[in-house]
Structure formats: C-alpha cells, structure tokens
Amino acid sequence: MRDFYEKVLGVVSAHTGFSEHQILHDRHEMCTDARYLLVHFLSRHLRCNEIVHLTGLSKQAVSQICNGYDARARFKYSLRSTAKSIEFELFG
C-alpha cells in the first residue's frame, strides 16, 4: 500500500513539477490539480480511509476530490492531458 502511494506520488510529482509538500498542502490551482490527480489514481486501488491515512488529508477533502474529479477534468484540458500521461506511466 505504501509502495503504491509513493509510486503514484512520484509520478504525479514528476509530471506536474511539484513536491510532495506542495501537492498535499499548497492552495494554488495547479497544486490543487496535482492533488486531484494523486487522489484520483490512488482511489483506483485504495479505499478512502487508506488514502486519508497515507496523505494526511481529511476524509472530507478526499471524498470531495473523489466525487469532484470528473467535473473538474471535464473543464480542464491540462488536467485531462496530464492524467493520460500519468495513467500511461503507471498502468501502461
């Protein structure tokens, strides 16, 4: 579980150019997008409470990201484009 988290975090960090701290704590829009990407890919293999434990984000924040990812991605080409690159690197 921890290995998967670190792998996803590393790939998201590499594709977005933000550090772990920035991804998890910064309020800038691009960092928020990176956080959405991180939680989106983690949620494919981990339950909400596991994501909360690994990231230190609140359960409410994780739920909001999981439930709001599709709407955010629908309107942001950069988010969709980065997600495709990350998905290819993580899952082939």
Predicted regions and their residues:
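Short Lys/Arg-enriched helix C-cap and helix-to-coil transition segments
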Residues: 72-92
